[in-house]
């Protein structure tokens, strides 16, 4: 008896027509049955936002005539896409959800703001093994071909071994040729941050407005971080948990005089 192929849900935050998701779809088609539910427009930096005070549209679309799998374009956020896919579109629970390939880094603190990773986290919340993939190239002409080998390797391992409940993977791939990438490293998230700046301007009507700018600052010198791995030419893999409890502080917090 033929073993049923794994069902793989593909989404992203750059939009359903973005080059990154097209590469991801092609790789996933080699590993299972694919269905795509992705935003109809770019949703970068949306984090785990969901649509609760507006209508949500989701319709089947044809991106390529040669595709035999189904694709759906959704007016909502990446997290919305996963929710509506699992609750309204799919007839069975996916074996895996993959999100990406993002244009740009989602390493370190960027994971908090990332729509790419929030889609993966939403899948994890729903008990679906999930991976977020990002390429450290913000160019509209980014070359995603070097990512294929590493995405396939990591995905095959997740399909084979599964992931613990409450854990998803954050994968970042350096902007290098495939032959220049040294391998894959399991890492921790670097303790870095953004130093934000606001560019204050005035529009023709005299109304002030702001553009958010800033720079990424990493003072974490640890050799086991995602930032260090990427700097050295490795693909970084960070196991991410969405239980935000600071377990190490519970005992100390319990000693406070909170009921006095």
Swiss-Prot record:
EC number in record: 3.1.3.5
Transmembrane segments: none
Keywords, alphabetical: Cytoplasm, Hydrolase, Metal-binding, Nucleotide-binding
GO molecular function: 5'-nucleotidase activity; metal ion binding; nucleotide binding
Entries under InterPro entries matching the protein: SurE, SurE-like_Pase/nucleotidase, SurE-like_sf
Subcellular locations according to the entry: Cytoplasm
Known catalytic reactions: a ribonucleoside 5'-phosphate + H2O = a ribonucleoside + phosphate
Binding, a divalent metal cation: 13-14, 44, 102
Main subcellular location: cytoplasm
GO cellular component: cytoplasm
One Pfam family per UniProt: SurE
Cofactor section: a divalent metal cation
Manner of cofactor binding, per the entry note: Binds 1 divalent metal cation per subunit.
Role according to the record: Nucleotidase that shows phosphatase activity on nucleoside 5'-monophosphates.
PANTHER family (UniProt xref): 5'-NUCLEOTIDASE SURE, PHOSPHATASE, PUTATIVE (AFU_ORTHOLOGUE AFUA_4G01070)-RELATED
Family under the similarity heading: Belongs to the SurE nucleotidase family.
Listed name of the protein: 5'-nucleotidase SurE
Species of provenance: Christiangramia forsetii (strain DSM 17595 / CGMCC 1.15422 / KT0803)
């Amino acid at each position: 008896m033929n073993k049923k192929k794994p069902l793989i849900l593909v989404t992203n935050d750059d939009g359903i027509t973005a080059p990154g998701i097209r590469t991801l779809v092609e790789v996933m088609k080699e590993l299972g049955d694919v269905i795509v539910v992705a935003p109809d427009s770019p949703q970068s930096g949306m984090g785990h936002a969901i649509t609760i005070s507006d209508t949500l549209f989701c319709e089947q679309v044809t991106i390529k005539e040669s595709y035999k799998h189904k694709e759906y374009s959704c007016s909502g956020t990446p997290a919305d896409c996963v929710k509506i896919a699992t609750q309204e579109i799919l007839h069975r629970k996916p074996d895996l959800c993959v999100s990406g390939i993002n244009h740009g880094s989602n390493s370190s603190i960027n994971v908090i703001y990332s729509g790419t990773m929030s889609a993966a986290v939403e899948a994890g919340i729903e008990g679906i093994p999930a991976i977020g993939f990002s390429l450290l190239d913000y160019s509209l002409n980014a070359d995603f071909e070097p990512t294929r080998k590493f995405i396939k390797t990591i995905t095959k391992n997740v399909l084979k071994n599964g992931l613990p409940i409450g854990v998803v993977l954050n994968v970042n791939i350096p902007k290098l040729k495939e032959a220049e990438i040294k391998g894959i490293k399991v890492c921790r998230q670097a303790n870095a941050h953004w130093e934000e700046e606001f560019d204050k301007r005035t529009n023709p009507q005299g109304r002030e407005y702001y553009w958010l700018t800033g720079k990424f600052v990493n003072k974490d010198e640890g050799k086991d971080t995602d930032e260090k791995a990427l700097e050295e030419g490795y693909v970084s893999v960070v196991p991410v948990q969405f239980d935000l409890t600071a377990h190490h502080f519970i005992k100390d917090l319990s000693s406070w005089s909170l009921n006095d």
